Amino acid sequence: MTDLKLAWRAWKTRYRDQVFELRAIRQALRGGGVALDVGANKGSYLYSMARWAGSSPVVAFEPQRTLARYLAGACQRAGLRNVTIENLGLSDRAGELDLFVPGDSHSPGASLEASIAEKTDCHKESVTVTTLDLYAVENLKGPVRVIKIDVEGHELAVVQGALGLIRRDKPLLVIECEGRHMPAGKTVQEFIALVVSLGYTATLAMPGLGELPAADFRDELHQKRAGERFWDAKDYYNNFIFRPTGAAS
């Protein structure tokens, strides 16, 4: 038994949209290990991560209540018994924060960054947040092998709240990062430099082309903001793969 929508999203992600990201995740999970899906949304990565993790736990964090409930049901229908769904946001501190959600329902563009509300109509939900370091101490056993992060501009805070875990376990990191979502005064290049300083090499995933060394990333070239839905353009790239220095690519 499976959830057809979840399986279809997983197929599209693995074989069309995020080929290089999923390939790296599969390699990192050989032999098992904990995997974390931060900003799981509707589970595009989750199905594959759960299968490849074997008997190891996979934890998905989704602060939108409707989507967290959906994921819990979808994983149950798909028989993904090693998956835990946490209706939590992740940040650099624990507490309560406002989640800004475009439109009047759930959205893949929901963010803990208030600046998103300056660009589009949003409604607010108060959500519980914690840090990955705190969560790991209280809930995780065994090394973390993979962390995927898609949090619409809040990735810097998520990484800052996970520095202990990252330094200890050196997991593969797959992180969406876009200049249009970065906090004021911050750049994609600065974010890349921070993660690289933790002992990583970085590449930009370019569907259909390959992986570009992240040092060659140029905002004006790889994330051009031309047209109404520029983020959907085939030559717009926003996923970075961070491998521990010395790991095979």
What spans do the regions from the language model cover?
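Phosphate/nucleotide-binding beta-alpha loop and adjacent structural elements of enzyme active sites
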Residues: 1-249
